[in-house]
């Protein structure tokens, strides 16, 4: 008796070639359902329709096609168990040797902006996962294929083993099947959960958090050469950095990607005027806004030209030739922008190892951040709060000018993306001093002011969290800073405010803290 293969796929890639090889090379008989059967018949391949094989028609508009004992009995039968063989014979059920199934494109459907809940529901596959799980469970007796990338491997397995398939290969395919159904069910559960989550309280009460990823590539190594690292994408469709275009340069490393993401989070704060951010080890070392992208780059670079060496540069406007020429004067790891002019691309070629990326995804924000801890992981909302000036409190006698408010807004946006304890000193919408990751706040203040030097005179200072004492205010005033922005909330806020008044400074309390660890 011929071996029996069941083919039922939504993605028809490679299907016809597989079916032809099964029939002509290995003497398989094929049963198939719905659109798959039509595709194969149109290609001249003899197929028995599932409804003809089971003696039961497809019903409910195709919702029920393969959910039948003649199908699942043939899949789940243990060929080495006499009782199973007897039951197959008694019920006129043939054992199935190969199941080729992939599922309705649920994730592709829900990725469409206008999709309705009813449309999404219709793309939830029922028969497909049932066959995949049954086949994967019974891998000792048959093979299951759930991806067209497996087809050639399966045929080669048959060719090198005289038409047989090794247990090792079948088990590997079974694992792929279970991963496929697990990811599929997770996508459905996540989508339905999001449909029902409407309030902040419901968001905080999710009892199960779903997280899975599809491998993009194995990276050369992790943070250090002795660490293994892999890059995954969420969902089946490439997005974010996975969908960015790499114009030139070496492959992206783990550290490159981490730094690029930090750069993206800064640059999306600035959507209008040309803005450039230069980062090193996820901390900004220079950020500037100006009338042209070249001027913004030059001022960001001047903010800390030493640290910019080997840094990551993110721009919110397309790169022109003049800016590309300026960037090639120093060693940089990566440059990313929403576009790059042809002349700029030519200039970058002189730095063949420089990674240049085009990414239109600067406006996207991941909904949450995740940190792994022993025994689990922590999930929090992304700190993408948009601060409103109307909510800020000017707590000093001296009032800010319109220009000073704009400067304080700029400094506040930048300090949000500096590791805590964080202090940023800016002037004319460019950073001139950054104190990052210090264990005490006044230490961060001193580092930022020392870096700024005389540029601090007339500048403003931003702090990601409150001042526990008034020493930071006094230190800033002594360096020539004219205005301070900070969240407030310290038991000794009054001391800091009093010091600011005494020294003629402006102080604004935002009421929002921006710790970053």
UniProtKB/Swiss-Prot annotation:
Its EC number is 2.1.2.3, 3.5.4.10. PROSITE patterns: MGS. GO terms for biological process: 'de novo' IMP biosynthetic process. Residues 1-146 form the MGS-like domain. It comes from the Bacteria. Pathway: Purine metabolism; IMP biosynthesis via de novo pathway; 5-formamido-1-(5-phospho-D-ribosyl)imidazole-4-carboxamide from 5-amino-1-(5-phospho-D-ribosyl)imidazole-4-carboxamide (10-formyl THF route): step 1/1; Purine metabolism; IMP biosynthesis via de novo pathway; IMP from 5-formamido-1-(5-phospho-D-ribosyl)imidazole-4-carboxamide: step 1/1. It catalyses: (6R)-10-formyltetrahydrofolate + 5-amino-1-(5-phospho-beta-D-ribosyl)imidazole-4-carboxamide = 5-formamido-1-(5-phospho-D-ribosyl)imidazole-4-carboxamide + (6S)-5,6,7,8-tetrahydrofolate; IMP + H2O = 5-formamido-1-(5-phospho-D-ribosyl)imidazole-4-carboxamide. GO terms for molecular function: IMP cyclohydrolase activity; phosphoribosylaminoimidazolecarboxamide formyltransferase activity. Keywords: Hydrolase, Multifunctional enzyme, Purine biosynthesis, Transferase. Gene3D superfamilies: 3.40.140.20, Methylglyoxal synthase-like domain. One of its GO terms (cellular component) is cytosol. InterPro entries: AICAR_Tfase_dup_dom_sf, Cytidine_deaminase-like, MGS-like_dom, MGS-like_dom_sf, PurH-like. Belongs to the PurH family. The IMP cyclohydrolase activity resides in the N-terminal region. This is Bifunctional purine biosynthesis protein PurH. The gene is purH.
